[in-house]
Amino acid sequence: MLFNSFEFLAFFLPITLTVYFILNRYGLDKPGKVWLLVCSLFFYAWWKPIYLILICTSMVINYFAGQKLNYIENPRTRKIFYIICLMGNLSVLLYYKYTNFLVDNLNLLLSHDLVIDKIALPLAISFFTFQKFAYITDSYKGETKGYDFLNFCLFVAFFPQLIAGPIVHHKDIMPQFQDPAKKQFNTDNFTKGLYIFLLGLIKKIAIADTFAIIANAGYGDATHLSFADSWITSIAYAIQLYFDFSGYSDMAIGAGLLFNIQLPINFNSPYKSTNLQDFWRRWHITLGNFLREYIYIPLGGNRKGELLTLNNLMVTFLVGGIWHGANWTFLIWGFMHGFGLVVHRLWQKTKIVMPDIVGLVITLLYVNFAWVFFRATSVADALAVLKSMVGMGGNIYAGSRVLTDIYLFPTLMMGLLLLFLKNPPQLAKEFQFNTRHLAYMVVLTLIGLLYLNSITSNDFLYFDF
């Protein structure tokens, strides 16, 4: 079920919200939580019901394993059990996400012809696996004692963040499900949440889905792009990805706020970054936080000398790359960001101050080149697009074949301008329910209805991860 689908907007969200607050209105706290959990699992099962078994089994096993970890006194036994828990979660992720990739590459390497059926990737497995990694690791440290099972299940399955984040941390979310003040309907949270949700909806259906037309046309013919088309294609995808994923995150934050649950901000105008380190403070913030806390710091962070620090950066972003998908393109994308951060760190040691505008341009160009690997379906296609972008792949003077519709070029320009406006969570801080904001919400709703009727609804890009 998509946030931008008729089923979600007309039935699922209003029914779930209404029943939840009615139950809490009459002091039925636990039935309210059970209702929200059941609805969240129904939301997940809409895609493929069979994988309910996977997520429910995983929740039960990880909860009780984490609680047991808190109370194992023998350090050696606790460490062994901790490793078993991590490997159990990792093995499930490896099986579903990487088996076909590994078999294909082994066949290529060893000249074998082993054939296995295509394994369907369970929705959101990368996201809820990361959450459980964090929970198990913190349980190993003795930091999750006394967690309630129902609250834990809601932490994992709460539908706004379940499918594609933001990647929430148990320390931030579970106390909110225990807070009595969060159980009652809050007009301020509701109007702010609705406002953020509508802004995210417009980002998705009016901007991201429009730029998808340009990006898909270009990458669908990656080996025959002109110089102009290759740049238009790459920029269109950079805009599409930002508005698609940040739009989803805004809709998730808004939907969470309808239930008085505050989810973390995931984007903070990343294309305004003046260096790559700044970019990762602004782009997919919750993923960056997770990689830092559970990969980079355990490796030693920056505490064990400069050489190991640079190595830790590379390893962290290689993990981040392969987390996104089972393809060499994602590994190369992760390598490019790790390498870029290494270069940035070495540059800082020169004490040479780069003008912000120069840093902004260099960062945008580098990130855009890296996105080519992120989007392309193969390394060969990515290299073909990059060759065209540097004038080596086709007629450098050829006009655009991608912008075939007259409205697409103005849309491209509009999207570039919108990148530099305030984020919906920033706008929400200034939000006060008055006539002006009511008018904004009515206009956003009308625009949303117009686009829902005129443009085919696309899946969110991060559903594939």
Predicted regions and their residues:
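Membrane-embedded transmembrane alpha-helical bundles that form the catalytic cores
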Residues: 1-415, 429-464
